[in-house]
Design a protein with these regions (language model features):
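OB-fold and OB-like single-stranded nucleic-acid-recognition modules
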Residues: 1-220
Length: 220
């Protein structure tokens, strides 16, 4: 999971995104008015993860005006535009996520994360794949074994929704953030009849506050 710095101006966004791709993308030209997958992948530090690319793109445009976002989307090439339509994020409050969230879909949530203590009474289980010989099977393990887990609080209702990220990422700040990820299934217990819930596997986040103008911008 990474913290990214959103674009503040449309010209900055276009210059960054219409970059010609990596050195081996010989058919892709910079500043040609077309943004393709190789160019988006370069600025996002990604290669073939199309779903994650769209998350990066959407979150990076957070502070642009609606008409400016439309200009950028209009410059995506045919294939990337279809990818954008396929993976466009649900924009939800934490209080809406359990009811409206769609498993395996991208989502962007806003709230204040509170780290769940591993020794607390929180229980939740996820399926993880394992290889048995040449056969892949799935077992259930506590989510806290694989992830840092948080309750993301909805400021309007004080309701919370579970978000999580890999343990090799830095702990999220205890402040209002905008976070992007993918909805995944979470079970309340190991029993087959256990309640099925959801959590957001977080990939990117930004501060909810717009940066001060005229400061240099660096994307991670």
């Amino acid at each position: 999971m990474k913290r990214i710095t959103p674009y503040e101006e449309i010209n900055e966004a276009l210059l960054s995104l219409d970059n010609g791709g990596r050195f081996y993308n010989i058919l892709t030209k910079s500043n040609d008015g077309i943004i393709d997958q190789s160019e988006l992948g370069k600025v996002g530090g990604l290669f073939n993860d199309k779903q994650k690319m769209i998350l990066f793109l959407e979150l990076s445009m957070t502070f642009l005006k609606n008409e400016e976002r439309k200009i950028i989307i209009g410059k995506l090439d045919k294939d990337l535009k279809q990818t954008y339509l396929n993976f466009k994020s649900q924009i939800l409050l934490p209080s809406e996520a359990n009811e409206k969230g769609i498993i395996a879909s991208n989502a962007i949530l806003t709230g204040v994360p509170k780290l769940v203590d591993e020794k607390s009474d929180f229980t939740g289980f996820i399926f993880v794949p394992i290889m048995t010989g040449k056969v892949m099977t799935f077992i259930m393990i506590p989510i806290v074994d694989n992830y840092n887990v948080y309750e993301l609080r909805d400021e309007k209702t004080s309701e919370t929704f579970i978000i999580a990220h890999s343990r090799d990422s830095k702990i999220l700040p205890n402040e209002k953030i905008i976070i992007a990820g993918v909805f995944k299934e979470l079970k309340s217990g190991k029993n087959e009849n256990s309640k099925i819930l959801k959590f957001l596997e977080a990939n990117y986040y930004i501060s909810e506050k717009k940066p001060v103008a005229n400061k240099s911008v660096k994307r991670k």
